[in-house]
Each structure stands twice: as C-alpha cells, then as structure tokens.
Amino acid sequence: MELNTIKPASGAKHAKRRVGRGIGSGLGKTAGRGHKGQKSRAGGYHKVGFEGGQMPLQRRLPKRGFKSLTLKYNAEVTLADLQVLAADEVDVPTLKQAGLVGERAKVVKVIKSGELSKKVVLKGIGATAGAKAAIEAAGGSVA
C-alpha cells in the first residue's frame, strides 16, 4: 500500500445534491422546498426557538437563581485537605501551590469535613466554628 493509491471505500462518498436543475432530476422547479411559505423564500426562516407566534418555551418558564460574581474568588478547603497538606503554617499562597484552591482565589475558608490530627496554624484564612474547634483541639490555631 502506498499513500498515492489510497481511496475511500466504494459507496462511502456521495455526489453533492444538485437542486433546481430540471424536472428530470426530481429536484427541479421548487428544489425540494415545497410551494410558497416563508421557508421556500430566499433568506426567509424563523429565529431559533420561534413557535409560530405562541409564547416560546424559554419565555414561558420562570427565571431562577442568579450567577454569583464573587464565587470565582471565594474558595473552601476541608480539614481532610489540611491533613494531607505537608505545610504546618497554611496561608493562601501555600494552598494555591498545593493546588487545593484556584489561582484566582482571594478568600479561603476552612470547613469541617473530615478529620484533623496534626497541628496546623492558619494565617489569613477563615474557618467555620466547627473547623476552628477541630483545629484548636489538634493543637493548632487560627490567626
């Protein structure tokens, strides 16, 4: 086999459909568009979601919720994440280097999920009441 001899399998390629080229082709005159109406005209078609004048689905359904603009800057870390983290002093840059929070995170909070048995000192990071109690019970502190 050589590159200049490769061909598609027979029947795999179809000739382009030529419309409006006489009645013998089966697609002459109206070219498969039917008779009259908006869809038969040049440049004539409805917008996406148009339901013939009926109130469209995207307007019939109620709006719900909103997209928080601060969400991308806020992050949370669990006690289990702190347990596997090698550092004893934890701040936002440390968490970013470890890949526990995103690069754009500005505010980080520790939540009580999982167990913590080692001493951890938090600097510039908030903690929920339960997480703070667990950190202090393990000998750590929240600054």
Swiss-Prot record:
Region named Disordered: 1-51
A single GO cellular-component term on record: cytosolic large ribosomal subunit
Pfam family, one: Ribosomal_L27A
Key words, A-Z: Ribonucleoprotein, Ribosomal protein, RNA-binding, rRNA-binding
Any Gene Ontology biological process: translation
Compositionally biased intervals (Gly residues): 21-31
GO molecular function annotation: rRNA binding; structural constituent of ribosome
InterPro entries in UniProt: Ribosomal_uL15, Ribosomal_uL15/eL18, Ribosomal_uL15/eL18_sf, Ribosomal_uL15_bac-type
Described function: Binds to the 23S rRNA.
Protein family per UniProt: Belongs to the universal ribosomal protein uL15 family.
Quaternary structure and partners: Part of the 50S ribosomal subunit.
The name this protein goes by in its record: Large ribosomal subunit protein uL15
Species of the source: Methylibium petroleiphilum (strain ATCC BAA-1232 / LMG 22953 / PM1)
